[in-house]
Structures are given as structure tokens and as C-alpha cells.
Amino acid sequence: MVMEMIAAADVREDDEDYQSPLDELFERLELRNPESLAVKQYKIYKQAAGKTAKSILISVGVRLAAFNLESIAGLTATDELELEQVGERKTAIFCVIPDNDSTFNFIVGMLYTQLFQMLYYSADIVHDGELPVPVHFLMDEFANVALPDEFDKLLSTMRSRQIFVSIILQNLAQIKALYKDSWESIVGNNDTLYYLGGNEQSTHKFMSEYLGKETLDTNTFGKSSGRSGSYSTNYQQAGRELLTADEVRLLDNDYALLFIRGERPIFDKKYDILKHPPYP
């Protein structure tokens, strides 16, 4: 529909009085609803000179070119997901994207943005602050999807509305590339951090620092012999990382590190999903 409207728009630089089919469409809309936001925004666009208006149309057409594809147009033509039911009843939505081509990953990003907006509206306006059915986002391929603006702020406010997120990354370098100034805030807004292992240096260093230090008690004994022999004992305390960055790198593949807010770090064996009872 949007691409049809863009196709109906036409600008003639030598004839400012020319009316395109899209101009006529907005005129009819203004007759029905003079206060329409769409009409007000379109009037702002129409203030542009012919050359500028044509440039705007070309830019919009290029940015939305993917929607000219029949498959994408068919996918987005009608609403079949019933997003308004998420948070109202038990629902599962699977968004599968290829790991070797990010061309259409923006569609999942659009879904995230729209869904977060609807969930916040439902929680705040319809249900007085909290969704009746908790919603959990499992964000695999987190670094490869366009996320809503100010996602770090959403992350700090969503839990009170019964909206939860699990962010899955290959390493910390991915989130640092996406959120150069706020990646620490995103990590800090997660109450649980589960490290399965990896081979990226800055991640090893971060995990080592996150684990903290242990205190080592050292007793040193000294003895000298001879006519004036003596005996001495020296007691010292020293700090050491629970795991150095190199030890984190060499972490056994069967083990993982678990950090839960307010608890000491946990070094435990990974769960074998194949042993889970419902596993087919």
C-alpha cells in the first residue's frame, strides 16, 4: 500500500499547479478529517520546491525499495500476527533470520519496535501498569537485528511491566560495537549473566574482573642455625583473581560461569538439553 502511494506521487518541476493522484487522495482525506495528522504532515512536504520534493520522493523510494519485492509486499500487506494479543494470552512468535544474509533483518527490527510499543501501551493504559501474561523475548542474533531506539532505556523499565529479555551474544565485542557509550548499562540492567565460553580477548578480561578476587593467606617460616639461631613466622594476605583472563579462556567446554545479582559467582556444569524429559 505504501509503495502504491509513492508510485502515485508525482512532481513536475515546471508545473507547480499539477496535482498527482496522491495529492487528490490527501485532498479527499482533508475534506473528511481536516485535523488528520497525515494531512498536516503532507502539507509540510508540499511546501518543498519541485526539485526538493522530487529528491524526497526518490530518497523514500530507495529506502523502501525492499517492499517492492512480491514476497516482502505479501508478508507485510495484512496483519496476521495479532500482536495485540501478546501479553493478553499465551503466545509464541518465532522470527527466523538467515545467519549469512542480513538484507531483511530490518523486518524483525520493525517487529521488535512495534511490539514493544504495543506492550508498553497495553501495560500502562489498558492494564494499569502490568501485563496479565508475562512476555519473554529470547533475542538470539541480538547483534544482527536493528533494535528500537534507546533500547538500553527500555531494558531498565520493562520488568515492572512484566516484559523480560534474554540477550544472546557471541562475545562482548558485538554489543560494544552496537552501543559504544551504553553497553555497560545494558549489561548492568540484566540481573543474570551466563557465560558459556568463547575466544574473544576483551570478554575474557571482563569476565575475570566480573568474578572479582579471592584472598590468599600466606604463612612464611624462617629458621637460622648457629650459636644465635632464630625462628620467625610471617603472616600475609594477598589478593588474586578468582580466574585470570587466561584461565577464563581455557574454561572447560563442559562448564559455564553464572552471575546472579546479589549472589556470589557460580562455576557449574552446563545442562545437557538432550537429557531434558520433553526433548523428542
Question: Where does each model-flagged region fall?
Answer:
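P-loop NTPase motor domains
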Residues: 1-163, 178, 238, 246-270, ...
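Conserved ATP-driven motor cores of ASCE-family P-loop NTPases powering translocation/secretion/packaging/pilus
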Residues: 155-257
